[in-house]
Amino acid sequence: MVTTEVRTAVSDKEPLQRSPELDSSTDFLDNDRLKETFSSGALDFDEWTLLISEIETTSFPDDIEKLCLVYDAFLLEFPLCHGYWRKYAYHKIKLCTLEDAVEVFERAVQAATYSVAVWLDYCAFAVAAYEDPHDVSRLFERGLSFIGKDYSCCTLWDKYIEYLLGQQQWSSLANVYLRTLKYPSKKLDLYYKNFRKIAASLKEKIKCRIDVNGDLSSDPMEEDLVHTRHTDEEISIVVRELMGPSSSSAVSKALHTYLSIGEQFYQDSRQLMEKISCFETQIRRPYFHVKPLDTNQLDNWHAYLSFGETYGDFDWAINLYERCLIPCANYTEFWFRYVDFVESKGGRELANFALARASQTFVKSASVIHLFNARFKEHVGDASAASVALSRCGEELGFGFVENVTKKANMEKRLGNFEAAVTTYREALNKTLIGKENLETTARLYVQFSRLKYVITNSADDAAQILLEGNENVPHCKLLLEELMRLLMMHGGSRQVDLLDPIIDKELSHQADSSDGLSAEDKEEISNLYMEFIDLSGTIHDVRKALGRHIKLFPHSARAKLRGSRPSGNLFRELIQRREKTRERLNQDLLTNKGISSIVDSPPKEKKESSLDSYGTQSKDAVRADYVNTEPNQGCLTSGHLVEGNDNVIERETLCESQSDLSMGLKANEGGKRSHEVSLPIQASPEHGFVTKQAHFSSNSVDTVKSDAIVIQPSGSQSPQSYQSQESLRQTGRNRYHRRDLNQMHRDSKPRSQERPPQMPYSPVGTGREILGQHMAFTHQDNRVALQSSTSQNPQNQFQNSALQMHPVVQTSNAYPQSQIHGQHMIVSPPESQNPQNQCQNSTSQVQTSFAYPQTQIPQNPVQSNYQQEGQMQSHEAYNQMWQQYYYSYYYYQQQQQLMSEQPQPNQNPQPQLDQNLVQLLSKQYQSQAKTQYLQPQQVEQVNTQQQSQEPQNQQQIQFQQQQQQQEWFQQQQQWQQQQYLLYIQQQQLQGEAKGDEQRLSMPQGSTTNSDIQKSQESGAVNEANLSSDTSISSI
């Protein structure tokens, strides 16, 4: 029986008496019901704790049998709950004998061998209950042998030191102080101080003995300490000599060795403590609980274990693993790691013991631990134990059932038990074929069984038979059909086509309802896979048969293949939308710059809004009209060059409908009049950081006639001589506008392969208004000249830009010679005449010009010669009008120069006045640009360099230089005009001689045609000669 002192030490409460009223209300807690509940495993941790609290405090506080039943069942499930072991032992102390309490503690240390709290409770019980001090000391030593290396075992060390001090066991106390320094702990520094104190007391004892006996030996504390390694047996001998009745010299030597061992232990522990302090400080829960640990805690333990494995102390690493498995007992990953580590170090017994604890107690419900145990047993050669362990892996249906069966059968195959492997699958299939709810599990088992059968027998027929059996037991299963086709595709070959085709045909022709059969998507996938198989293994007859069935069942797939992919129809719509955005942005920029620009707006009648067709795209006429009437920005008018920025590039790329669209320069206004537009190639130079682009026009031969030309008249004038030609042009233009609309339908289908070249915009000039920076610029780079003409505000006489396309070398045969300005070919021809004899086509011309309106077809038969003189007269009139327009434009340009230099005229429109500094800056910029336009490229570079390095020169000097340069240029133009006129007279003479020969001939039509061809060739040769002479003159 337990003594009264033990009862008092364990519990201060008096035993509670059972109340009779509770007997009737606690029938549900009878032992049989409790055993049934415990065996079912239906209780979780919280329910267990509630049940124990109910029995202890209310129902059966003194029923030791019921308490033992509950505690035994609970601690079997959760053996690491040291608090419940202590409570269970206290119940034994109160209600049973001391031996019963000792038995409980022994079970506790067996279940939780490395738990500091369990050993502390056990030793505290021993100090209070045991009468023999040696029994208590042996219990302390036993516990310290397991947990003495634990970082948190200082509580047990403190309890042991307290007990030894009470018992005055100095020899044992000296040994304990030395051992506390061997491994790092929370109180390592405190233990070292106590060690130094006991060493000092021993030194005083030795000094007293020396004084009494007169021993002259040296003081051991003054000698150098030599650090050497000592075993536990040697340490015990040293302590025995130190505390025993030995001579002073022996005691002094023992004390020196004792101090040396202590210092070595402390230094080593201190170094190790510095390394593990980072891990120890992150441990938040060193005890067991069912609540999961956070990720940081788990990662810290993994890192701590990795350090322990590499440190080199196997015993300390084992203690670290055992300490980790207390809070991490529910994590199988740590058990796997522990077993692998100790097995790699040769501790197979420790590995088996760890696996037994994990698979039977701590994580026994996890199938992975049983699988790991089985593979470990198989690895060590224990096949029977491996089979037993594998039998515990989820034999019940549910999650992981197929995997467990497969692994068990594969293990039997590895062990050579082929029949046992087949039996494993057969037993599992018998379980799954009982109900229809396990059809998916059954199909997966058949797939794995077929693979195992092929590996064992190396026969595709045997494996296919397993799958055919599965298809009969689990009909309309996509998984089995796919596995069967893949198996036969890899191993069966053509001999299995007759076997597989009826099965596939049956599945595809089966009419699926809501509960049976394959879906339409599954059928299509099965049919596609079968066509792959039949294409690989079948004949052409089989392929056509399978393809016909597939198209019949799934016609949409065939249509998709035949139709293919087409480009999106929204590309053109997006292009038109980008055009609209670009045009709106340009208009906004023009409105923004209107304060410093003096551009005269176009008449409202000609500013038409772009219309959209039914598909949301803008018509070509609207786009062309909007583009032609768009006002140029201030930069273009001021500099005289066309600077190509990003917006201009987008504008030209998107608005270029076709090559022929660039050549159309006529636009009918609402008043019936026609405005003429002329645009020439422009040589732009880099200026103000922008990259300018060379304007390059190319002619288009579509719907063009060589005799078509454009009438150029001075602005604001209509001479009587030109009225007849203009009226003829109006009549012809009305008829051709209808044809141009028809020709646009043909041009839409042509690719837009050419980038729209930049054009120099021309705006009309109003009376009394000054256009700031508007002038005529001539450049000599690449033999190109940009001519800008100014016209009146009258809508009937207004000149607009024309998109004439030219190349540097263009040969045309018209009624008059081509006008050339410094190597540039500018085409100017009279209005269309009804006399086709005046239209001489040049067969050797490389590029034909494309005029501003569609051309009418010219009959090939010659007409009466009385129209010849009228055509020549019109040619002379057009030639005179061209040079009259040129002189007028040049005179008007000089007037603008003078007005600009003297004083700026106020704008007619109510606009805010410019700042005087801004006006001066714009004037200087305009004058510098006008100067550089008439210089050679080398001179332009010199002028730019001088302008950057020197201050701006006087305005009068710049104007004087400009006038001199203009006079020199005008003299050159007069010489060139005379040469051109001589060439023109020669050409007219040659044409007159050729036409006179035609009139003298009176041959049939067939011979006339041959002679015309010969004469046209001769005329082409003459034109080539004239062209070469023109080129030479222009180069001069």
From Swiss-Prot:
What are the record keywords, sorted? mRNA processing, mRNA splicing, Nucleus, Repeat
Compositionally skewed regions (Low complexity) per UniProt: 714-726
Where does this one sit in the cell?
A: Nucleus
Chain intervals for the UniProt region annotation (Disordered): 1-24, 595-618, 714-767, 995-1036
InterPro entries from the entry?
Answer: HAT, TPR-like_helical_dom_sf
Q: Where are the HAT repeats?
A: 62-94, 96-128, 131-166, 168-201, 278-310, 312-344
CC annotations in GO: nucleus
One Gene Ontology term of the biological-process aspect is:
RNA splicing
Biased composition (Basic and acidic residues) is annotated at 740-755
Supply the Pfam families for this chain: HAT_PRP39_C (PF23241), HAT_PRP39_N (PF23240)
Q: Where is the composition biased (Polar residues)?
A: 1002-1036
> What is the superkingdom listed in this entry's lineage?
Eukaryota
**Does the record carry Iron-sulfur as a key word?**
no
Question: What role does this protein play?
Answer: Involved in pre-mRNA splicing.
Protein family membership: Belongs to the PRP39 family.
**What's the protein name?**
Pre-mRNA-processing factor 39-2
* The species this protein was found in: Arabidopsis thaliana (Mouse-ear cress)
